[in-house]
């Protein structure tokens, strides 16, 4: 890791402005070709590579051989294969070895916090020695939406704050330890753009240890899939902002005036969640436009045929559908399920003692001098409902990762005016209207979602022992 440039700690005068106190082993990610065709792909690519070597030497001997060879190679490329799939999986994926197994047992023991330690309670500590975990310009997989420095943000202090739990320490994210745990497995973030924000963070945390040309992102429908080819592992994001079916399920075109959901219909999404080793869910921000939610009537043929139902009632129906699906379709011996709690909005500066501010604009420091939690007007009924559902799961444990309070204090870390709208950077005219255009929902990277992943990493490694030195490779 490149040693970060030393940053000066924030001055005490500044703080007074704050308020007091590879593809999976069994089934690859969905593709446009059939699963049987995909299963045969590695064998065909191996045959293609072997045949190519033989044919290349024959090309020099006869024009007829050359013509036959050309037709043969064309047939190998076209027969029974989807062009997109061939483009995504190159021949060298099957000619070069996997990453060497990382000898985790040779490392110092990983000091994990005790189960009794509440990782969600603590404080933010300025740390310009070990942070940031990566540099924005060094992670080429970052989207423009969260690349705040590249988008013109003039300060970078938000990157240098480490989360310190009150009664224990949080292990530093070790990408090699994590990827050994992920070898031959799938991890999938399911939800809205905040879960995508966290997925991007995780990709940036692991990508430095992966060889050039052996890592890539493929976007297909509702999926963004990061392939760590040396580990035959995938880190995936799946767009489902309400978890259940809605009229906002198109991952590219979902800016809809009237959001309508089907609380009892989940299969079109959930069928894509099967055979995944780690499932990380979220859903909150898309519920917050109105107190009542538009709900499609049962057996209706149009989204326009709907009723308005109180938000908390609809949320409860969705989580009944979601939890039932998990109980009936997830094998807890294979799959670990996590749920990320509320990620806050910072739209009301008076809530942190800055009544003259405009949303999160020009905030450069966390809330530091606090003695009690901030009140940011979260709908805590929704938080409590998810916690109750998780507690009452019978066969499939759901682990809540509480990111809410720690993130509440980070008014400084949002993308604010240094983001994009409809694929374009904000214009000077838009920046002049921060009340309308400042994004105080999403987070700059590197930043707060790195800590969320640090906690996820800790929870995953706390649940099991180190992997065997020589586990079998997943079938190709």
From Swiss-Prot:
Top-level taxon of the source organism: Eukaryota
Sequence motif: DXXH motif, positions: 439-442
Uppermost EC category: transferase
Residue numbers covered by motif GDS motif: 191-193
GO biological processes: xylan acetylation
Principal location listed in the UniProt entry: Golgi
Tissue: Highly expressed in leaves. Expressed in roots, stems and inflorescences.
Membrane-spanning ranges: 64-80
Pfam families, sorted: PC-Esterase, PMR5N
Catalytic activity, EC: 2.3.1.-
GO CC annotation terms, alphabetical: Golgi apparatus; Golgi membrane
UniProt-recorded Gene Ontology molecular function terms: O-acetyltransferase activity; xylan O-acetyltransferase activity
Sorted UniProt keywords: Disulfide bond, Glycoprotein, Golgi apparatus, Membrane, Signal-anchor, Transferase, Transmembrane, Transmembrane helix
Biased segments, Pro residues type: 19-31
InterPro entries cross-referenced by the UniProt entry: TBL, TBL_C, TBL_N
Cystine connections: 117-168, 139-204, 148-444, 360-440
Keyword Cell inner membrane on entry: no
Active-site residues, Swiss-Prot/TrEMBL: 193 (nucleophile), 439 (proton donor), 442 (proton acceptor)
Reported function: Xylan acetyltransferase required for 2-O- and 3-O-monoacetylation of xylosyl residues in xylan. Catalyzes the 2-O-acetylation of xylan, followed by nonenzymatic acetyl migration to the O-3 position, resulting in products that are monoacetylated at both O-2 and O-3 positions.
Protein name in UniProt: Xylan O-acetyltransferase 4
Originating gene: XOAT4
């Amino acid at each position: 890791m490149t040693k970060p440039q030393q940053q000066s700690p924030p001055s005490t005068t500044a703080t007074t402005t704050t308020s007091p106190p590879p593809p999976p082993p069994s089934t690859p990610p969905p593709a446009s070709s059939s699963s049987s065709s995909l299963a045969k792909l590695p064998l065909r690519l191996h045959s293609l590579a072997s045949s190519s070597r033989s044919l290349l030497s024959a090309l020099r001997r006869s024009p007829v051989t050359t013509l036959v060879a050309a037709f043969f190679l064309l047939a190998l490329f076209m027969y029974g294969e989807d062009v997109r799939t061939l483009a995504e999986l190159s021949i060298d994926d099957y000619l070069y070895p996997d990453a060497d197994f990382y000898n985790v047992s040779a490392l110092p023991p990983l000091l994990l916090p005790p189960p009794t330690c509440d990782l969600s309670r603590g404080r933010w500590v300025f740390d310009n020695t070990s942070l940031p975990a990566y540099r924005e310009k060094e992670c080429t997989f970052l989207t423009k939406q969260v690349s705040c420095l590249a988008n013109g943000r003039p300060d970078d202090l938000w990157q240098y704050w480490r989360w310190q739990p009150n009664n224990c320490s949080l292990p530093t994210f070790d990408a090699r330890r994590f990827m050994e745990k992920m070898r031959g497995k799938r991890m999938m973030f399911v939800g809205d753009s905040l879960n995508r924000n966290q997925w991007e963070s995780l990709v940036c945390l692991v990508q430095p240890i992966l060889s050039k040309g052996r890592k890539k992102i493929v976007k297909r429908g509702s999926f963004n899939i990061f392939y760590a080819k040396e580990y035959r592992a995938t880190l995936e994001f799946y767009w489902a902002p309400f978890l259940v079916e809605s009229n906002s399920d198109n991952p590219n075109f979902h800016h809809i005036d009237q959001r309508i959901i089907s609380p009892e219909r989940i299969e079109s999404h959930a069928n894509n969640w099967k055979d995944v080793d780690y499932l990380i869910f979220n859903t909150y921000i898309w519920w917050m436009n109105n107190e009542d939610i538009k709900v499609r009537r049962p057996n209706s043929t149009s989204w326009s045929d709907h009723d308005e139902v109180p938000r908390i009632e609809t949320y409860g129906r969705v989580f009944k559908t979601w939890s039932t699906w998990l109980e009936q379709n997830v094998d807890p011996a294979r799959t670990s399920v996590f749920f990320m709690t509320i990620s806050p909005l910072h739209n009301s500066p008076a809530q942190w003692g800055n009544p003259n501010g405009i949303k999160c604009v020009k905030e450069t420091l966390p809330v530091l001098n606090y003695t009690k939690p901030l009140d940011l007007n979260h709908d805590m009924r929704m938080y409590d409902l998810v916690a109750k559902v998780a507690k009452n799961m019978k066969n499939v444990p759901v682990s809540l990762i509480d990111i809410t309070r720690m993130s509440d204090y980070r008014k400084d870390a949002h993308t604010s005016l240094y983001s994009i709208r409809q694929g374009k950077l904000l214009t000077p005219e838009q920046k002049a209207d921060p009340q309308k255009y400042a994004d105080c929902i999403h987070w700059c990277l590197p930043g707060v979602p790195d800590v969320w992943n640090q906690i996820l990493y800790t929870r995953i490694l706390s649940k099991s022992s180190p992997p065997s030195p020589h586990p079998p490779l997943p079938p190709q």
